[in-house]
Amino acid sequence: MLAEYLVHVGRVNVFLDPETKDIPKCVADLKFPLPLTLSRSTPINPIIRSDTIQLVISCPPVTYSDEIQVPWKAIDLNKDDAVKSTIKCKQCQSFLTSISSWKDLPSANWMEMLDCWSCHTDYPTVLSKRGGPSMFQPTDDCAYLGTSYVLIRLQSLEGKVAYGPNFKLHCSFCNAELGLPNNKDSSNGVRLDKSSICIDDQKIHPSFIVASEILTLRDMYATHKFVIVDGERSIWTWCFVPHLPISFQKSPFSSIEFANSPISTIKLLYQLEVPPDFTKSSEDWMDIPVSSHAFDEISHVLEKGNLSFPVSAQKFGPWKVGLLPKFHKQMI
């Protein structure tokens, strides 16, 4: 059983389990937490359907913070000067490198910001003072943090990583995919995917990272359409509801560790095939590149979320309905 709280319309939808059987008598009382807290005096008007109970709530909408929380920010990782953070391969736990200083990149697309900045300044003069076009050069001790990746100095990973097909970065010990190429980065920096590594033995599920990336890009570019890609496969997604508190009786996300229900999610409409209205001239779809392993995990989460709804709520036209859990710092 799954319940969703539609914040802006003041309604809770309680979806019955797709395997629920119709028994014409009361066999038990079931306590189920709703994804919001109400006083006992709040009027509730239930609308009962074959597979859904709609609760119309006569109270002001509950407000939620619009802050986008991103896994592993600099403030979370920086420690005393004498203590370094250890980075390991998530799959085989092999040591990759250690970092003593972390800095946040200013934007999901920081190179575009630099290009814009260079167009509005005395470029040759500034470059001669700074020694080059990039202000974000990782060192052996300092790494930079993006929304979904860690920018590391390539030389500090010597002997620990190797380039595979399509210039993807792989672990030299277990061949797990660690990073994705990006020709906008500095020549001595490589991107390690946050979902492919452990930092101080902490790991982050790919769905949290992709959810943060979707919300960040949505906020920055006012777009709602994204393509999650691993180089060969694609998931076409619409960010339908950016903030959806849900409660569940049995978690549809068996591969992720959650705090107690309710949790905060993004409600997505998604397809594994190219949408029928897509044309090559469409420029409002934004790519979110992920590793092959992360793609499999995200596909699994979306499918499990979809199957937790009754059949009548699993699709919206040709689109499937899915959920991605949002990250909160209390999770690590």
From Swiss-Prot:
Name of the molecule in the record: Uncharacterized protein C1734.10c
Organism superkingdom: Eukaryota
Organism of this sequence: Schizosaccharomyces pombe (strain 972 / ATCC 24843) (Fission yeast)
GO molecular function, one term: ubiquitin protein ligase activity
GO CC terms in record: cytosol; nucleus; ubiquitin ligase complex
InterPro entries hit by this protein: UBQ-conj_enz_E2-bd_prot
Pfam families in alphabetical order: HECT_2
Chain segments annotated as coiled-coil in the UniProt record: none
UniProt record, GO biological process: co-transcriptional mRNA 3'-end processing, cleavage and polyadenylation pathway; proteasome-mediated ubiquitin-dependent protein catabolic process; protein autoubiquitination; protein monoubiquitination; protein polyubiquitination
